[in-house]
């Protein structure tokens, strides 16, 4: 940005460990148009920051949030622990499949919103939901997938290990007036065991794991709840194939597969899979 030159903001040199600006992250709501800028800096003080903000907002009125993250470690991890709101809100708002979501600097939110809607709608269609269904949303994040399911079912139970994401999911449920979605910060295995003891019997378990896929312990814990269906959203075909094979060993049958291209002209692909229980 021109501001970097005008205000002499030096980029961080990883080898020399000099400079101020490590990363500039821009988030933009596809439907809202709201923008967030996140400056990742090596130290707390940004010289003439008020003037920088004034210039940015004047040139880009869609910017509703400017955040500073401080990362003084010699690491390739993008964010440090401390976030400061320099201007506006600490979130921006966007919508997906009719629901609104507050998105913070740390929130996971698909960058290709239009195709993410197709991805989630495919998962909904595959699951063939009824008003009596109970859905467990493992790896629930800020609630984007589970809340998309919620209007079609009796209840959604979401679990996520990142506490901030769980708070975001609860806030997003309230933002949309959704009262049948419940979120906890826990490991999926432990949460499912607790829910099972409390008599919760899911008809669908929804999973959207990271690239490493599911653990064997997770698969065993999910199978123990005996859901009729497992709807699996994957970003890694190799680990997805491995996990499907294990589900098949536990009595589940692969019913449907649909790739969805969220990242055109790359080798990355998202895939929605439906498995159903054929025996106990």
Model-derived features with residue positions:
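Internal alpha/beta scaffold segment
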Residues: 1-15, 19-20, 42-67
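A short linear hydrophobic-aromatic micro-motif
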Residues: 10-13, 24-25, 255-259
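Short edge beta-strands and adjacent turn/loop segments
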Residues: 18-31
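Short, aliphatic-rich beta-strand segments
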Residues: 26, 33-42, 100-104, 204
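Residue-level recognition of strand-loop junctions within catalytic nucleotide-signaling folds
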Residues: 29, 42, 276-278
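Short flexible coil/turn linkers enriched for glycine and charged/polar residues
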Residues: 30-33, 62
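Intrinsically disordered, low-complexity acidic/polar segments
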Residues: 33-35, 46-48, 75-77
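Rossmann-like S-adenosyl-L-methionine
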Residues: 51-58, 62-280
